[in-house]
């Protein structure tokens, strides 16, 4: 079924950038791999308007305040972290002790991450240990955020939700691992995909990236992490990359195959 979704950041961009039109993103899904249907006149008009707009407004899709992306897609505010605030100062001190211990434990020769070949496979160990140690810290509670439907989900932003039980203040944490020398890289390392049912940002909160820097692994695959940083995302700016996607199911449709060496459908 074809569906038209209003672009959640159109209002924000119109206000901030002065864009004089409302954009709509067209999502075509062929979940049941049924024969393609002819788009309605409304859908075609939306596509015809969207493509030229994307081509002309590329520069306008950069430097978008992440706080506005979150508010427009979830209705929740990204709060700035003032380190001089009494509650923030206390929580930051507790978090700093935890992150020091996380790095020390995972750098140890007997750490479960030692010998893991790919850094992507290491990330979950950081999430689990951060969660474990924060939960052992008096006055703090940390867990995987619940989605709008009430379930817990590890994938997607943010990874962890920390609650200060005295003030009931919420902090969202998203651990990131990066190699020494790559702090200034322009390669994409962060993404946020607005969702409804699986939205995990359900509170006004401080949003933190928890960055861990690591040396390039030696031949013996020993990981060594050298520093951590807590990054406040209240002034973070993002850009939108518009792309049209399709799956193998969408491509390899029987009616679209005009020649093959195969003997028949799999």
Could you say what each language-model-derived stretch is?
Residues 35-129:
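Interdomain/boundary linker segments immediately adjacent to catalytic/signaling cores
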Residues 178, 183-214:
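Short, charged, amphipathic alpha-helix that recurs within catalytic cores of restriction-modification
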Residues 160-162, 171-179:
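Conserved catalytic cores of phosphodiester-cleaving nucleases, focusing on short active-site segments
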Residues 120, 127, 131-163, 167:
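A short acidic/basic microdomain associated with nuclease active sites
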Residues 2-20:
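Bacterial N-terminal signal peptides that target proteins for export
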Residues 25-32:
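C-terminal segment of classical bacterial N-terminal signal peptides
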Residues 201-264:
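Domain-level recognition of nuclease-like catalytic cores that cleave nucleotide substrates
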């Amino acid at each position: 079924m074809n569906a038209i979704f209003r672009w959640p950041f159109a209002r924000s961009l119109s206000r901030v950038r002065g864009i004089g039109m409302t954009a709509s993103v067209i999502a075509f899904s062929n979940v049941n791999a049924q024969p393609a249907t002819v788009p309605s006149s409304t859908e075609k008009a939306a596509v015809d308007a969207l493509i030229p707009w994307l081509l002309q407004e590329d520069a306008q899709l950069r430097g978008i305040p992440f706080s506005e992306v979150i508010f427009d897609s979830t209705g929740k505010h990204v709060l700035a972290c003032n380190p001089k605030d009494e509650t923030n100062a206390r929580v930051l001190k507790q978090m700093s002790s935890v992150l020091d211990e996380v790095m020390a434990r995972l750098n140890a020769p007997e750490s479960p991450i030692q010998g893991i070949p790919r850094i992507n496979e290491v990330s979950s160990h950081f999430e689990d240990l951060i969660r474990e140690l924060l939960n052992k810290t008096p006055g703090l509670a940390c867990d995987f955020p619940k989605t709008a439907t009430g379930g817990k989900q590890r994938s997607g932003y943010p990874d962890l939700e920390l609650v200060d039980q005295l003030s009931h203040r919420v902090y969202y944490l998203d651990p990131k691992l990066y190699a020494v020398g790559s702090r200034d890289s322009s390669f994409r390392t962060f993404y946020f995909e607005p969702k409804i049912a699986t939205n995990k940002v359900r509170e006004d909160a401080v949003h933190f990236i928890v960055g861990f820097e690591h040396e390039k692994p030696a031949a013996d695959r020993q990981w060594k992490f050298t520093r951590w940083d807590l990054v406040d995302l209240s002034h973070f700016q993002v850009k939108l990359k518009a792309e049209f996607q399709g799956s193998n199911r969408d491509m390899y449709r029987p009616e679209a195959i005009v020649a093959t060496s195969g003997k028949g459908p799999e």
